[in-house]
Amino acid sequence: MTFPNINPIIFSVGPLAVSWYSLSYVVGILFGWFYASKIIEKFPTQITKKNLEEFVTYAIIGIIVGGRLGYILLYNPYKYFSNPIEILKTYEGGMSFHGGAIGVIIAAYIFCKRHKLNFLSLTDIIAPVVPIGLFFGRIANFINGELYGRVTNSSIGVIFPDSDLNLRHPSQLYEAFFEGLVLFCILAYAVFKRNTIKKQGLNSGLFLMFYSLFRIIIEIFREPDVQIGFIFDSLTMGQILSMPLLLLGIYLIIKTECRSITK
């Protein structure tokens, strides 16, 4: 299948341009905010709706600054340091999930310190929400024809306009499905059917573990960034960055369950 060359800019009014990438962030944040509010309503904790409203600004800054700096430092430092003006062109893409995650974690830590809130209580509310943003972000990647997969002979292969005209795995859609929809359903089941909110740290651990597993597996089908290629002959940067998160997720789950047993 040949992918249509879709303009990354949806529309523009004078100097203001609205891109698919920007829209995915806005929609993801709005839907995420709404969903987190519903979780707080059903499962009251130390975190209130007012806390959530105040944290949204922190989260946006963490996502944008962390995501952009993460991509620049981890994936393409030479390009941006040699032409710093490119750093500001976030509408063209170039955001790192791992960088954004670190940005939000730092933002959450600062917010909790200032408001005397428990850090894991907040991240347990955030964790079930993140797959919403991941879903819309990967759909935007697909529309932009970027971050595509490796060459394939499969019937589901797509010829992307900016690639080498070979059929390639639509790995953006794989990620949207597993890291977005499937992970959302797993965490929704955990929250609403298993009441995991009462086990501090469990939602955070489940998110980290399942996201990392899905990312490590899907990276097998995703084309490595051309400026980095493979690391240690077979691993991608995404896989390497996901491994510590996987271990942290498993640690949080075990710690939470052990704490529940001893109570």
Curated annotation (Swiss-Prot):
A 1,2-diacyl-sn-glycero-3-phospho-(1'-sn-glycerol) binds at R138. PROSITE patterns: LGT. Its main location: membrane. The keyword Transmembrane applies. Its EC number is 2.5.1.145. Pathway: Protein modification; lipoprotein biosynthesis (diacylglyceryl transfer). The keyword Transmembrane helix applies. It is found in: Cell inner membrane. Keywords: Cell inner membrane, Cell membrane, Membrane, Transferase, Transmembrane, Transmembrane helix. It is a multi-pass membrane protein. The chain crosses the membrane at residues 16-36, 55-75, 92-112, 117-137, 172-192, 201-221, 234-254. GO terms for molecular function: phosphatidylglycerol-prolipoprotein diacylglyceryl transferase activity. One of its GO terms (biological process) is lipoprotein biosynthetic process. GO terms for cellular component: plasma membrane. Belongs to the Lgt family. PANTHER family: PHOSPHATIDYLGLYCEROL--PROLIPOPROTEIN DIACYLGLYCERYL TRANSFERASE, PROLIPOPROTEIN DIACYLGLYCERYL TRANSFERASE. Catalyzes the transfer of the diacylglyceryl group from phosphatidylglycerol to the sulfhydryl group of the N-terminal cysteine of a prolipoprotein, the first step in the formation of mature lipoproteins. This is Phosphatidylglycerol--prolipoprotein diacylglyceryl transferase. It comes from Rickettsia bellii (strain OSU 85-389). The lineage of its organism: Bacteria, Pseudomonadati, Pseudomonadota, Alphaproteobacteria, Rickettsiales.
